[in-house]
């Protein structure tokens, strides 16, 4: 065989090997195109999917900034310096359906809901291989139901009218009971139907948490106390006052926490990343997070929002909340931690809210119990303001 023929044979063989290898490479399934039924197979798959849900939930486009800011920006406690345009339209009640913050909340709320729906659907058919695997997946399902209810509640209240006899038949949001295929036609349902699904998801979250072997989770996750806290908030909005009182008490008991009563403890809730005795569920941040303009902390003060001086003047001189609200700092609680002023853990449910829910519910129920309402109010107010004279608080409709 001549040298030319030898080289030709070698080249042909090399090309055949190369094409085969290339063909194998090109037929790899992209990681972003794995079908859901193949993506959620092992317990680790479900944990990974749930981590993705929490990432979406804590994004600055949802509970990491927008949802929390949109409730405070247009209120009487807030001023805007126009240092930037951030939330300025919302501050002035010039809210269009093209507002970027509104669009972000809608998109990220539904992305979180969709991911929860996928965990729930695939988890229902999970087959246990190793003992304990099923309980781990059922724990993921419990959290998925709880987060789905939480997101649906926020979206319903932002894109629907407040729950009432007059409003409950008006359009709310799109109910999601299972993953929605791409390009499907969907429709909004009534506010009443939204609330019905929210309560159903809360019930299912409790049922899954009650299953054998399912463990509770920490306060940076939707734990059992957080599920009860959500139920209390939802039922208060629905004017189901007895249900709100019961659910709030369940959250108080399950949390095992206490309301802080010193300036140092109050300040530490917002200037450190330590878990507080008041926390029920919070969006956890890391010390090295770099959020810059997207931080809720940056929005308050540097990017325009501040607590107005008239609000601060309402506090008693010894009120422990002045540890954060007093002085030259005008950004309220959101001053950040000592080593990174862009971050703070962001509370979603806290113990004081549960006592205040009970106070409002006792005062507004069909047969008001103003004595109980005052008692629950003082669980928070007396600890915040050591100078408070509880004898000055009347046991009548003015208690709230």
Language-model region placement:
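Hydrophobic-face positions in mid-chain alpha helices that act as interaction patches
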Residues: 48, 78, 221, 239, ...
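Conserved, well-structured interaction surfaces
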Residues: 85-159, 189, 206-211, 243, ...
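Inward-facing hydrophobic residues that define packing positions of alpha-helical scaffold repeats
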Residues: 50, 113-116, 153, 195, ...
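Membrane-proximal, proline-rich intrinsically disordered regions
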Residues: 22-70, 248, 374-378, 388-391
